[in-house]
Amino acid sequence: MVQAVWHTVQDAGWKNIKINEEDFKKISGLRKKGGFAELADSPKFYLWQGEKKFIIKTDSYRKNLKRKERCVRMIEDILKYNKEFVEKKAYEPYLTSKYPDKKLAILTCMDTRLTELLPAALGIKNGDAKIIKNAGGVITHPYGSVMRSLLVGILELGVEEIMVIGHTDCGVQGMDGHHMLEELVERGVSQEHINVIKSTGTDLEKWLGGFESVEQSVKDTVYALKHHPLMPTGIKITGFIMDSVTGGLEAVEEKK
C-alpha cells in the first residue's frame, strides 16, 4: 500500500490521494504526531487525518501543503532549535541591556530581505538600537502602535534620534486594498463583518492599501513624526531608502 501511494504521488508530482479508513490501517511504518500521521519510512511524505479520510502529500511542494500542517512542522523545528540554543548557551554573545547604546530608533519595513541586511549594513549590533518594523515602515495611524513605540523609546529608553528607512522593491508599493479585501473573503472572513467595519467609517481599502512611491512614503512618514503633537523637541528625525540588494543608503530630502 505504501509503495502504491509512493508511485502515485511521484507520477503525479503533487496530488491529494484519499485513502479510506480500512486502507489506512494497513499502512505499515506509520507513526502519529498529534492530529497528524507520518510515514516513518518515507519522511518526505506524510498523512493528514480528517473525517476518516487520509490525504498523502509531498513535502517538496510546501506551498501546496495545508497551512496547519506547515505550521505544525515549522513550530516543532523552531522549538527543537530553541531548546538546543539555550542548552548550548548560544545566547551569551547577545547579552545586553534594554537601553539602546546608540540612543537610536529605526522605523523600517518587515521585509525578510532586511532581517540581517539592515543591521549589518548600518553596523548595528545587538543592544545598539530599537528597531520597529511593519509593512512598509509607515505610520498608518497617528496614535497607533508605531507612534506609541517610538514615544516609549524616547521617554523611557533614552532614544534621541529616529531613522525612517524605506527600501527598494518594497512589496507594499502598489498594494491594492480592494484586492486584499476580496482575498480575505476567499480566506473565510465574513463579508458581513467587513461591511460592519466599513459602516463605522473605517476605510479598509485605504488601511490595507499601499503607497505609490517609496520616496514619497518616507517623506510623509518623516513629516508626520516631526509634526506630531506629542513628539518631544530635540529629537533628530531623518529619512532614507535602502537598496534591498546591496544595503546602500540614500538620504531622502525632507518634505517641504
Show the residue positions of the predicted features:
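Divalent-metal-activated hydrolytic enzyme cores
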Residues: 72-102, 137-142, 157, 172-256
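Divalent metal-coordination and catalytic microenvironments
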Residues: 106, 164, 247
